[in-house]
């Protein structure tokens, strides 16, 4: 391992202890490396503004940071176990290439605000991807709701047949859910969009750092003012980001549950594209919906990441090394969550309903609610109408059709009035 940034002269570092301290940081930091480089460039510019670096030194640092980013992207530079973390790797490279200019880059900052700013930039990008994917999923659902508005589908409560519903209603429900998920992700971007660079280890420094410049240069909406809060916000912002992701993966879990049921032989309402299924290693007849099952499992990983960070935050104010573990939680949580969400738009666009199976699952009792409401409209007190309809449920469907039931469902949002124009307007607002 290269020289440790914090190592004191004459003090030997035990290899086992150092391995424990570093953990899997150097692997996780590959996620944050390019963001750390971008923040280092902005920090160097700020140092030049206050006279710590000359224009020549700034030019050399900026050039070498750009080269390091290019080498990392191409694979010419590998962030591996010879470095303690991404911060050490950047400083080692700059010192090797530039000498004292590289040794000056850390003036006025700590690895604490380095990882804070890199993480904030990373979280902004990941949350924007959650918002984009949620909007894509909502658009697929809106398009299919429009195209299949009148397709009868059995509606369930308690996983028991309940009323006549429609594919349009089913799709519209998921469209609105993922519009909300996109809004929540965008709102969370606004929360985390604050610049902690320049807060150092949580108490500021005796330098007039140009924090306004780094805020603008890195594209942050505002300055995170208090160095104390900068440390308090670590974990808190990660938790908020995972909650926004979890809102999307929670709905993903529920839609995957629907599809798990609907693709089973007992329902057979839906056929999945072949590429979303696998076979059995022993049963030649099997076509397993493994993709949607693993989608369903994804929320567990996101929830676990949330729980891990929540437990880490049982701490007093100030920096604590415990917080290092928050990196693994967000990397794993967002890694699993986004990978699953990426697959959902195409899956939803290509699934096929089986209208004959859907119609066969609509039985006479599913019209009983219609009968009760119609009697109430005619003047029968609803509770009496309810009792009468319950007693005659087995014959409630006589003379009725699924299409007739759907056409009568005129309450706003129901099958005859899906209000897709309202949802479309909300979807359009996401892109504004």
Swiss-Prot record:
Disulfide bonds: none annotated. It is found in: Cytoplasm. It catalyses: 2-(N(omega)-L-arginino)succinate = fumarate + L-arginine. Its main location: cytoplasm. GO terms for cellular component: cytosol. PROSITE patterns: FUMARATE_LYASES. This is Argininosuccinate lyase. The lineage of its organism: Bacteria, Pseudomonadati, Pseudomonadota, Gammaproteobacteria, Lysobacterales.
């Amino acid at each position: 391992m290269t020289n440790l940034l914090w190592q004191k002269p004459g003090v030997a570092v035990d290899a086992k202890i150092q391995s424990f301290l570093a953990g899997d940081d150097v692997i996780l930091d590959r996620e944050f490396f390019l963001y750390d480089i971008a923040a280092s460039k902005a920090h160097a510019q700020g140092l030049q503004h206050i006279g710590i670096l000359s224009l020549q030194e700034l030019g050399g640092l900026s050039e070498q940071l750009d080269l390091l980013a290019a080498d990392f992207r191409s694979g010419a530079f590998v962030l591996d176990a010879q470095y303690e973390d991404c911060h050490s790797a950047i400083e080692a490279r700059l010192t090797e290439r530039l000498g004292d200019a590289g040794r000056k880059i850390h003036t006025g900052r700590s690895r604490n605000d380095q990882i804070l700013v890199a993480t904030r930039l990373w979280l902004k990008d990941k949350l924007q991807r959650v918002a984009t994917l949620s909007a894509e999923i909502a658009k697929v659902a809106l398009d299919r709701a429009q195209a299949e508005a009148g397709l009868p589908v059995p509606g369930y409560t308690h996983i028991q047949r309940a009323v006549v519903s429609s594919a349009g209603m089913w799709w519209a429900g998921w469209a609105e859910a993922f519009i909300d998920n996109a809004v929540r992700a965008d709102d969370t971007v606004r929360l985390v969009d604050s610049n902690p660079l320049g807060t150092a280890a949580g108490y500021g420094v005796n330098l007039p750092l140009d924090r306004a410049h780094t805020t603008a240069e890195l594209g942050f909406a505002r300055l995170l003012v208090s160095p104390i809060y900068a440390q308090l916000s670590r974990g808190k912002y990660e938790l908020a980001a995972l909650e926004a992701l979890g809102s999307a993966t929670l709905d993903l879990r529920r839609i995957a549950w629907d599809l798990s049921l609907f693709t089973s032989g007992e329902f057979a309402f839906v056929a999945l594209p072949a590429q979303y299924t696998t076979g059995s290693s022993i049963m030649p007849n099997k076509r397993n919906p493994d993709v949607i099952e693993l989608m369903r499992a994804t929320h567990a990983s996101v929830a676990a990441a949330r729980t891990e960070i929540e437990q880490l935050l049982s701490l007093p104010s100030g920096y604590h090394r415990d917080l290092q573990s928050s990196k693994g939680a967000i990397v794993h949580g967002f890694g699993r969550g986004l990978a699953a969400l990426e697959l959902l738009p195409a899956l939803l666009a290509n699934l096929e309903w089986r209208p004959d199976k859907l119609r066969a699952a609509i039985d006479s009792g599913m019209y009983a609610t219609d009968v009760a409401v119609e009697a109430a409209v005619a003047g029968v007190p609803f509770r009496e109408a309810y009792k009468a309809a319950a007693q005659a449920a087995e014959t409630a469907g006589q003379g009725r059709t699924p299409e007739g039931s759907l056409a009568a469902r005129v309450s706003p949002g129901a099958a005859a009035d899906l209000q897709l124009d309202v949802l479309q307007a909300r979807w359009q607002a996401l892109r504004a």
